[in-house]
Structures are given as structure tokens and as C-alpha cells.
């Protein structure tokens, strides 16, 4: 009897799968980032995707307070989005801060919504978190709509929250608590299922 290899995916939905970011993803992510420069510029500033910038990112995701994921198409494995859970706090807090990126070639197809649903399930399941926060600039209507669809609630406004492209930018703080999750992925696509 042949042994069944475990899936490299942390979760699968109908169209996308979730897995950890790997060093081998650099070339594909660099190309996607370059192609998406105009999409990202207003919210992330100018970011040249160099190996020198990618390596520290991988190192950061190797630490307990950070998780880095890619959302990829189930059929081809092509990367369609990136997600980070940063600043993970344990103890009495059990929370993390969510960051996410779509790529120009695949925006508007619902891949990021499906993939973030998998990340949320993974964060509130195997990661053991109770709360996720997302800090989003007020003019970033696509990201604001996305977190609203996923059930996040606006909890406040943070003036001059983060430096982007040399200037302090305001952000809205959105949060989701584990008991308030909206189903965005059919149960058959549960995170961690093999």
C-alpha cells in the first residue's frame, strides 16, 4: 500500500490553497510585485522586490511572532496573493496583525477573499489566536470592502499610524474575534484538511 504524502497546504478552498512562503517563491513574487507597482504604489509606496529585501522577510517569518503565507491557485500553484500575520502576541492576548497583498493580474476575482478566509481559519485554529487586526488607510476602499466582507469591525482611527514612502499615514483599525467569523470557504475546504 502506497503511503499518502501530507499536503503542503495549510488549507484549501474551491479555487485557492494556502501555504507558507518559501525562498523558492522569490522570482515569482518579484515579478508579480513589479507588474503590480501601480496597484500598490498608493498604499505601500515604491518597493523594489530585491533578494536583499526578501531574505530578511523570510527570516522574520521564521520567528514565533510572524507568519508569512502565499495564496496560490489549486490547479496550477500560481501565486495570486500574499498574507502576513505579524506582531503575534501570546499569553492573555492571543492576537496578531494581518497584512495582505493582491496582484494586478488576478484582482477582482475573489481569490484574496477566499484565501484570507483560509488564513483566518488557520489563525483561529492551529495558530491558536483569538483576535486578528488589520490597519488600513481610509482611501483604500478595496481593502476596506474586503475586511468588511470577512466580518471585521471598525474599532477606531489611528492618525499618523505608519510611515509609507516617507510620510506618516492615517489608518483605520479593523478587528475580527474568533467567535465572530463569517464562513467564506465551504467546510470541505477547512484549513489543515489533507
Where does each model-flagged region fall?
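Acyl-donor (CoA/ACP) binding surface of acyl/acetyltransferases
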Residues: 1-28, 32-39, 68-194
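An amphipathic alpha-helix signature
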Residues: 23-30, 51, 55, 59
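Conserved GNAT-fold acetyl-CoA-binding loop/helix
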Residues: 38-58
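A short helix-loop-beta-strand connector motif used in the catalytic cores of GNAT acetyltransferases and
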Residues: 58-70
